[in-house]
Regions:
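Short, surface-exposed amphipathic charged segments that create phosphate/polyanion-binding patches used
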Residues: 161-171
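Alpha-helical substrate-recognition element adjacent to the catalytic core
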Residues: 1-162
Length: 171
């Protein structure tokens, strides 16, 4: 007879980020850095889906359309010099709800020290899944307490058509 009735012993806790771990939106430090009024940005984002539908774009993902608007700000020069390094730095300005990030390691520690959980080799893992900017989350004080972060990446350089010659990147 099997000594362990559990075939999976890791408990994965999946967290959203904005308004779950922090009281507002992670983009606020970005707006402050570039002196952009956040309310104006979000009002524009809210109006984008209807505007794009009128242009024939029916399948606009409402949760991530703000990313296209960030790119519009980059192209227009309003977010001049935006980089992953800067996003990570700005992530350090994010303020978390009281008790965070301390709650993450406290839960892991509680489970690890509890003999009942130890008997079955039960462990807790914390993951963040967000439509936010991954580099900002990685720069925040909660990142070191997570087991994985899935979020949107800002691709700084786009490779031109034909960048692969014979299956290898060309320098």
């Amino acid at each position: 007879m099997a000594s362990n009735i559990f075939t999976q012993t890791n408990i994965a806790v999946i967290w959203d980020f904005d308004k779950t771990l922090i009281p507002g939106y992670m983009q606020e430090p970005l707006f402050r850095h570039y002196n952009v009024e956040g309310r104006t940005f979000w009002r524009e984002v809210k109006a984008l889906p209807e505007h794009l539908r009128r242009e024939g774009h029916e399948m606009v993902a409402v949760d991530s359309i703000y990313l296209n608007h960030i790119l519009a700000y980059v192209r227009s020069g309003l977010f001049k010099g935006l980089s992953n390094r800067l996003l990570r730095e700005l992530g350090g300005e994010l303020e978390f709800y009281p008790g965070l990030p301390e709650f993450f390691p406290a839960v892991k520690d509680h489970v690890a020290k509890n003999p009942l959980f130890g008997k079955y080799d039960i462990k807790v893992e914390h993951y963040i899944v967000s439509t936010g900017l991954r580099q900002m989350i990685l720069g925040s004080k909660i990142a070191e307490h997570t087991d994985g972060i899935w979020a949107c990446e800002f691709v700084e350089c786009r490779l031109p058509p034909g960048y692969l010659k014979e299956g290898k990147p060309q320098s």
